Swiss-Prot record:
Protein name: UPF0758 protein Swol_1642
Keywords in alphabetical order: Hydrolase, Metal-binding, Metalloprotease, Protease, Zinc
Keyword Metal-binding on entry: yes
Domain of life assignment: Bacteria
Gene3D superfamilies named in the record: 5' to 3' exonuclease, C-terminal subdomain, Cytidine Deaminase, domain 2
CDD domains: MPN_DUF2466 (cd08071)
Placement of sequence motif JAMM motif: 184-197
Source organism of the structure: Syntrophomonas wolfei subsp. wolfei (strain DSM 2245B / Goettingen)
InterPro entries: MPN, RadC_JAB, RuvA_2-like, UPF0758, UPF0758_CS, UPF0758_N
One GO MF term attached to the UniProt entry: metal ion binding
GO biological process, any: proteolysis
Lineage of the organism: Bacteria, Bacillati, Bacillota, Clostridia, Eubacteriales
Length: 235
């Protein structure tokens, strides 16, 4: 961004550099991450406009929107220039995007191992690969393989927050699910399963056999790719 425009109000900038006007004229896909974030923020501070605030916020986190996916309100408001109103707007925008994707994908039918991996790629990969903490998510399916719902069971890591069968199967029973797909991410970016990943999966599979609920796969998501424990022959 040209330093000449740093301390200007957005309205004082040339129209071609204003995020909202650029979106209207050229389309949302022509905006970079900072410009999109500036629109969500709505306004800047006394020291900088919304676009510069967005650029500085991203710069503090490696230039990526990744941290916004799992940031709490407390973490957002700890950032310079981000008050509660801006933090709430960010959280609402992230959640709205998540729900749009979720509503589309809930129509999916999953019947084969290939369907499982495709569903994980399209439903969870893009979102979960950006998380900086481990999220353990479960996709619940009906008897025909239809996706009923999905739910994050644990946040914080399999090591610090052990996944208990009770939490995993509570929603399955409530929703009358016939099978499940387990998904979690590795913030390190390497989807290689740990021994603990394998042991937890096998423990959940045994619990599922008792309850008559099949676990179809456990997919671990990394930064670039993913690992299916089923495809690896680990379960």
């Amino acid at each position: 961004m040209n330093e000449y425009f740093v301390n200007l109000n957005i309205k004082e900038m040339p129209e071609t550099m204003r995020p909202r006007e650029k979106l209207i004229a050229r389309g949302e896909d022509k905006l970079d991450e900072a410009e999109l974030l500036a629109i969500v923020l709505g306004s800047g501070t006394r020291e900088m406009n919304a676009l510069e605030l967005a650029r500085q916020l991203l710069a503090r986190h490696g230039g990526s929107l990744r941290f916004l996916m799992s940031a709490t309100l407390e973490e957002l408001t700890a950032e310079k220039g981000i008050g509660m109103a801006k933090a709430v707007s960010i959280k609402a925008a992230i959640e709205m995007g998540r729900r749009v994707v979720g509503n589309i994908q809930l129509r999916r039918i999953i019947k084969s191992p290939e369907d499982v991996q495709e569903a994980v790629r399209e439903l969870a990969m893009e979102e979960m690969r950006h998380y900086d903490r481990e999220h353990f998510r479960v996709l619940y399916l009906d008897r025909k393989g239809g996706l009923i719902t999905m739910q994050d069971i644990s946040i914080g890591g399999l090591h610090s927050s052990i996944v208990h069968p009770r939490e995993v199967f509570k929603t399955a029973v409530k929703k009358s699910a016939a099978s499940m797909i387990l998904v979690h991410n590795h913030p390190s970016g390497d989807p290689t399963p740990s021994q603990e990943d394998i042991e937890i999966t096998r423990r959940l599979i045994e619990a599922g056999k008792i309850m008559g609920i099949e676990i179809l796969d456990h997919v671990i998501i990394g930064e670039i790719n993913y690992c299916s424990l089923k495809a690896r022959g680990l379960i």
